[in-house]
Amino acid sequence: MSEQTFHGTTILCAKRNGEMVIGGDGQVTLGHVVMKGNARKVRRLFNGKILAGFAGATADAFTLFERFEGKLQTHNGQLMRAAVEMAKDWRTDRALRKLEAMMLVADADNMLLISGTGDVIEPAHDFISIGSGGSYAHSAAQALMENTDLSAKDVVEKALNIAADLCIYTNHNLTIESLNKED
């Protein structure tokens, strides 16, 4: 019997005109079966001031969100500091090292990708994506950012829907969270 693995998801973060947005789909797939269509893979952390989304094994997400929120508390909401400390732990902690996931995190000004290999990456553009449909969402977001005046929220929604049309591990049941610089 072959080992079945959890697949999927698409998470996209975009920033425009003082608005930071992270969105993700809700599909959880085990092997060739959709197990759940309405999972929440995007959350608000640290009293709503930080947005986070994950791609990877669903069970791992809860551990990652909890750990990252702890780092935010320890470092008083400093996104970069919390991300670097989280990545360090992820790389060195035996239990965390086995987690197969990636996270996008953002405050009102900055967005970061945190990987299980200990990388903390700040994107070159005002958008970044992860997950099985990440390249589709990234391409769509780039076209929308370069050729329209859509808000960050609209870019995220449209790009995720395009990814859902193309990626079998991504659906149209979206969760979208946003922060405004003025908040």
From Swiss-Prot:
It catalyses: ATP-dependent cleavage of peptide bonds with broad specificity. It is found in: Cytoplasm. It comes from the Bacteria. One of its GO terms (molecular function) is threonine-type endopeptidase activity. Keywords: Allosteric enzyme, Cytoplasm, Hydrolase, Metal-binding, Protease, Sodium, Threonine protease. One of its GO terms (cellular component) is proteasome core complex. The active site is at 9. Its EC number is 3.4.25.2. Signal peptide: none annotated. Na(+) binds at residues 164, 167, 170. It is an enzyme of class 3 (hydrolase). PROSITE patterns: PROTEASOME_BETA_2 (PS51476). Belongs to the peptidase T1B family. HslV subfamily. Coiled coil: none annotated. Gene3D superfamilies: Glutamine Phosphoribosylpyrophosphate, subunit 1, domain 1. Allosterically activated by HslU binding. A double ring-shaped homohexamer of HslV is capped on each side by a ring-shaped HslU homohexamer. The assembly of the HslU/HslV complex is dependent on binding of ATP. This is ATP-dependent protease subunit HslV. Protease subunit of a proteasome-like degradation complex believed to be a general protein degrading machinery. It holds the Pfam family Proteasome. Its main location: cytoplasm. PANTHER family: ATP-DEPENDENT PROTEASE SUBUNIT HSLV, METALLOPROTEASE TLDD. NCBIfam families: ATP_dep_HslV, PRK05456.1. GO terms for biological process: proteolysis involved in protein catabolic process.
